[in-house]
């Protein structure tokens, strides 16, 4: 299981590379293997040019992509994302949801917790909770895609 935090939870004095490689320490990989895999995953989230940057040198969207990369580095089949776009502007939110769309197409299950209806529309299934109880559980008949979303932003 990989986990994406709303507030990124990156180590402030560590580079993007070290933040992403951290879970691999606990997996028992040696430093060379950790760094190779971390670089590969950072490149997959379009941060190949930011590998040696610390969190304070990255934008909010870049920090969230580092957090996503960290969640992916152990090749989890399930990713839990807590308000992954909560601290981001709408354009960067669309980019993050596009990234999740790509990850899902590779076979990963992604569970997103959000209060934002427009973000929930990217899901195949939407479960709404009220006071901790399931209020509705529906399949989404029209799943929002990155392509649709980015086009609507460009058209505005």
Regions picked out by a protein language model, each given a short descriptive name:
Residues 122-128:
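Conserved catalytic segment of ABC-fold P-loop ATPases
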């Amino acid at each position: 299981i990989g986990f994406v935090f709303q507030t990124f939870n990156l180590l402030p004095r560590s580079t993007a590379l070290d933040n992403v490689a951290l879970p691999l320490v606990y997996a028992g990989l040696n430093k060379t293997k950790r760094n190779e895999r971390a670089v590969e995953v950072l490149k997959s989230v379009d941060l190949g040019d930011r590998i040696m940057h610390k969190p304070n040198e990255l934008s909010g969207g870049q920090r969230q992509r580092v957090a996503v990369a960290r969640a992916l580095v152990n090749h989890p089949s399930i990713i839990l994302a807590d308000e992954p776009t909560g601290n981001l502007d709408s354009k960067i939110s669309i980019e993050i949801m596009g990234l999740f769309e790509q990850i899902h197409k590779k076979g990963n299950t992604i569970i997103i917790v959000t209060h934002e209806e427009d973000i929930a529309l990217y899901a195949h299934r939407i479960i709404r909770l009220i006071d901790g109880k399931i209020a509705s559980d529906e399949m989404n008949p029209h799943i929002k895609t990155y392509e649709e979303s980015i086009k609507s932003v460009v058209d505005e």
